């Protein structure tokens, strides 16, 4: 199993190209199921989750061709995928694939809309009554689907096709919004989604769907209106830059000090995170190429932050911010309001000497002037990269184990950091 070795203490200086957003690329790939023509997606990141979704779509009979730079090439370029779902041969998404990635459950919407049926395994680890898929299923039922849970599968049918509906989510749900949006494009009549998630990735998916012939307005706001159409066609679309990746590297620069250009990053996608970084002592400048992040001389200032849906501070940057605050000059508080049990990185950060106390969904971090390198273990995607950020500033050597989590969401992380002066390497085996 691969590991990452880091020797801390180097400032980061240079340019980091920002990859396409995983959280847009996955639903965009799934949207290809809505048409029998070819969807061409540019700037798709080379990630383990993208490769897994290719396998899942292939199981349905989808043909995918890839072009672009190969892993290991020094020059960054996202791959281009040509996705053709002309011949869907199977509407079942089996447990052995869906259990590996929750977002793969989203195929239920496009399959139901186009094929009028879908049998999709429930994602692993979903307790009855607290499943994130409950709101998603509710939305599809509003659109006229008949869905029963049988043997761990959502068995969905819409013999007469889907119809427009008023869908009001009781709480903001990214997955529910994505699936309702995709399914409603082929429904008869008008669908109105209220209390919709406002994430930029949802607006990006809607933009692509409109290029395919959908009639969607309001995506990126809490009220989305979809006029159903009879058929969607092929299109070409470039995945928007990954605001979470950009925010992660920005926090790494704030942690180590230095001066880095985040090439392709868009400040309007991540203003809440940039505001927090400025409060913490970083200098942020918008440039023609993206965003420039600097911290030279001044210390890291403590901040108090609560996660919230877009445009608030994203939960996917919470662990990275906590790593940064371990070296702040004072006490910080971070409250997690989106997900339960998202403080699994606390125990591993403590191995560096971090002082973090938990009280329910709030973490209090007492900043320390120095961290020390240690062997640590990644527990999930965002937690794993927080350990890398801590290691970059720690004295001595750190070995990060179970880095397959990193490969799910960060393209060539060690190459990008190494190019900016970090002492970091992947150790295979």
From Swiss-Prot:
Function: Cell wall formation. Adds enolpyruvyl to UDP-N-acetylglucosamine.
HAMAP family referenced in this protein's UniProt entry, alphabetically: MurA
Pathway field: Cell wall biogenesis; peptidoglycan biosynthesis
Family: Belongs to the EPSP synthase family. MurA subfamily.
A GO cellular-component term linked to this record: cytoplasm
Protein name: UDP-N-acetylglucosamine 1-carboxyvinyltransferase
Active site: residue positions: 126 (proton donor)
Reactions mediated catalytically: phosphoenolpyruvate + UDP-N-acetyl-alpha-D-glucosamine = UDP-N-acetyl-3-O-(1-carboxyvinyl)-alpha-D-glucosamine + phosphate
BP term (GO), one: cell division
Keywords: Cell cycle, Cell division, Cell shape, Cell wall biogenesis/degradation, Cytoplasm, Peptidoglycan synthesis, Pyruvate, Transferase
Enzyme Commission number, as recorded: 2.5.1.7
Modified residues (2-(S-cysteinyl)pyruvic acid O-phosphothioketal): 126
